[in-house]
């Protein structure tokens, strides 16, 4: 699938499953308690995050998908905290409130980026009335849903998931399952089931080879009538079995792994969102793999925007050491170029509508060194700087046009309002800005100069500006 700016905003996905509140107490430790041989943590901050199925819903919302979340919570303050976290992100919460169960809460005490202890507040109660109440809400939500995700953490919400899958099938809504436990028959009839390797081998037994895994996966898919089965294998990548097609394998997209927290939630969220857009399992798996590779390279539970995901896929489709590269991949190429004695020039901007003034400016900038980098503001960054009607052209279109300019070697992107972070990350040899700047007012100039680089101010060609073009065209 060629990279395209995926528009998830007209899609609605229903998430059903075990919702949790992840709570973090952060503080310093400097002494041992006189009461027991344990550290004393002086709590300085408290952080609340959606967890479990709620994290899946949050990930979808950050992709730009319209999301409804259904789950069981207690009639307590933590349920209200969780709902506020989610609703602030645009998630519609349809919680079933229990008078006898608490909201599942996992409290982690953290100090110096290390977890000292985790306290779990949870109880399980499989009741007919709870299952019926849940089914009623799901049935109400299905008609407006493009897909449903069942996020099972074996905490009791999906005790009767088979009935919910039957409801989704009756409504002709595809269902995607992130499973748990040692009985996958409860997921019979689902569209796609996504176990990790450990969960898969719990069902089928240890697999001594990829061939054996594929054979067992094929048999399991056929046994339970799934259209597709996706086995995630960590550093060994993913394997997809769908319909009567040959197994489809992908190597992991992760280059560095800092934290796998929430990676499975990211996979099922992106997988489902892309599938409802493309209707192709392979496309969905390719995007999900890249998204997982991105989030495991971040500390803590991370998510990914549609814009960043599309930029990553755009770069991947070009598969070259020049052109559009992520900041991390670009840094590798810069180091190689500098080892070869090449001087790296950097400039940045929105470049919403490329005009002759831009082209002349790029030629001047390139003449100051051997390689020219152009860093582009993402769409969200442009909106913050220029207003809600901008950009006229989305990030992928802007980078694609810049990539075709002969004087430009590399194109990358940044999310922030200023290029300070990306300049400090890449540390070019020459920093260039156009217009009425002075060196003292150029963002990142101090960093480049401190590292022995140069800062240059170029004059723009008179008579050209993006704003005047937009005004003339009444855009």
Curated annotation (Swiss-Prot):
GO biological process, one term: ADP-L-glycero-beta-D-manno-heptose biosynthetic process
One GO CC annotation: cytosol
MF (Gene Ontology): ATP binding; heptose 7-phosphate kinase activity; heptose-1-phosphate adenylyltransferase activity; phosphotransferase activity, alcohol group as acceptor
Keywords for this protein: ATP-binding, Carbohydrate metabolism, Kinase, Multifunctional enzyme, Nucleotide-binding, Nucleotidyltransferase, Transferase
One Pfam family per UniProt: CTP_transf_like
Reaction catalyzed: D-glycero-beta-D-manno-heptose 7-phosphate + ATP = D-glycero-beta-D-manno-heptose 1,7-bisphosphate + ADP + H(+); D-glycero-beta-D-manno-heptose 1-phosphate + ATP + H(+) = ADP-D-glycero-beta-D-manno-heptose + diphosphate
Record's keyword annotation contains Thylakoid: no
Sequence segments annotated as region (Cytidylyltransferase): 346-475
Sequence positions that bind ATP: 196-199
Segments for region (Ribokinase): 1-320
Pathway given in the UniProt record: Nucleotide-sugar biosynthesis; ADP-L-glycero-beta-D-manno-heptose biosynthesis; ADP-L-glycero-beta-D-manno-heptose from D-glycero-beta-D-manno-heptose 7-phosphate: step 1/4; Nucleotide-sugar biosynthesis; ADP-L-glycero-beta-D-manno-heptose biosynthesis; ADP-L-glycero-beta-D-manno-heptose from D-glycero-beta-D-manno-heptose 7-phosphate: step 3/4
Active site residues per record: 265
Cited InterPro entries: Bifunc_HldE, Carboh/pur_kinase_PfkB_CS, Cyt_trans-like, PfkB_dom, RfaE_dom_I, RfaE_dom_II, Ribokinase-like, Rossmann-like_a/b/a_fold
E.C. number: 2.7.1.167, 2.7.7.70
Nucleotide-binding keyword on record: yes
Protein family membership: In the N-terminal section; belongs to the carbohydrate kinase PfkB family. In the C-terminal section; belongs to the cytidylyltransferase family.
Function per UniProt: Catalyzes the ADP transfer from ATP to D-glycero-beta-D-manno-heptose 1-phosphate, yielding ADP-D-glycero-beta-D-manno-heptose.
Quaternary structure and interacting proteins, as annotated: Homodimer.
Protein name, entry field: Bifunctional protein HldE
Organism: Marinomonas sp. (strain MWYL1)
Gene: hldE
